[in-house]
Amino acid sequence: MATEPKKAAAQNSPEDEGLLIVKIEEEEFIHGQDTCLQRSELLKQELCRQLFRQFCYQDSPGPREALSRLRELCCQWLKPEIHTKEQILELLVLEQFLTILPGDLQAWVHEHYPESGEEAVTILEDLERGTDEAVLQVQAHEHGQEIFQKKVSPPGPALNVKLQPVETKAHFDSSEPQLLWDCDNESENSRSMPKLEIFEKIESQRIISGRISGYISEASGESQDICKSAGRVKRQWEKESGESQRLSSAQDEGFGKILTHKNTVRGEIISHDGCERRLNLNSNEFTHQKSCKHGTCDQSFKWNSDFINHQIIYAGEKNHQYGKSFKSPKLAKHAAVFSGDKTHQCNECGKAFRHSSKLARHQRIHTGERCYECNECGKSFAESSDLTRHRRIHTGERPFGCKECGRAFNLNSHLIRHQRIHTREKPYECSECGKTFRVSSHLIRHFRIHTGEKPYECSECGRAFSQSSNLSQHQRIHMRENLLM
């Protein structure tokens, strides 16, 4: 008698598939919530770190108060009551690693919220691989000669610096146009300038025309070395009448006339006439008084680098017509970085990602790789954040406390779910009847009333139920029958 219902239930494969889809969607939704919460925690951690590093002695009334405040800020950042010694060590190593990176690379890595030094290295390696094929060309501005390799022989001391796009066989680490100093020296006692090396760094895999790194040394009678900051992007400076210099863009029409700076060399601050921007050479940062505005679409940007990126996207495939920095096929690949194309695709399920590090993390789902192991019980996890949450089971730690009732939780998502009891918030609404719920799982359970889905089946008689609690209650009937027999 019991075999016939089992055969009938086995034929309901569409229902089983529907159940599987519902479970997968529920897991993806919960995973998405955990990802947002994790990113929020990383942002909070970074804020605490900056408060600790930027604390000044003048902010406290005395030395004892200063020490106490520093200790408090350090605990807020490293959270020794939550993190293990290994995790605290990893945070310190990661901070120092980001500190020694150039400023542009720091910004790029920070945007991806790395949790460990290994993740930061993976992000940088991904960035290098994506920009290895950029081909650049430098042309002499006045003589029309193409200059390859990394040296220039200037004719005189009045510095007349010109910027041109370059195409060279040398290997570069960025998709940014290479910049070359073209120095004119008119002094009789001048000697040939030293070799000038062309370097470039990357800011969020963007073409940086607005951020200037390094220090500019003045020429006073005799030629001096004007390339003092090795490993940084060199920018074009044009000295007019011995009073001002002008910084211009490498591609007038492709990028638009973005930057035409009239600079004062005497001070540390350089002002921009068009948008009243101010550049601090020492801090390598722009402090805007106004936003740069794109003339075609009227969109404004706070940072010049964002403005340039917008110009690139807006120009699209037209960029290759105005300069020799990129040829058409390479331009398409280069522009894909800014357009948000997901070029890294999973061979198993076809899901695409923008960065190879995210793809590598995703592929652990298919391979079953679990590289993070618990020292207490030996259980392994695919994500470091999962291991951190698991360790709280052993430590009994519940760092997330409710301010209303004092109840504590080991996960922030559980605290958020609990707080809806106090706020009476019900964000999950049924599209069929409009009924709302505090938890997404309650909405999924309720939705089975409308769909008629009964995913929980009794192994004894084949009867199906919409809720697992009803199945458990039903199975007690069979248990009693077995005891009586």
Swiss-Prot record:
There is a cross-link at K23, K162, K195 (Glycyl lysine isopeptide (Lys-Gly) (interchain with G-Cter in SUMO2)). One of its GO terms (molecular function) is DNA-binding transcription factor activity, RNA polymerase II-specific. The keyword Secreted does not apply. The keyword Chaperone does not apply. Pfam families: SCAN (PF02023), zf-C2H2 (PF00096). Belongs to the krueppel C2H2-type zinc-finger protein family. This is Zinc finger protein 165. It comes from Homo sapiens. The lineage of its organism: Eukaryota, Metazoa, Chordata, Craniata, Vertebrata.
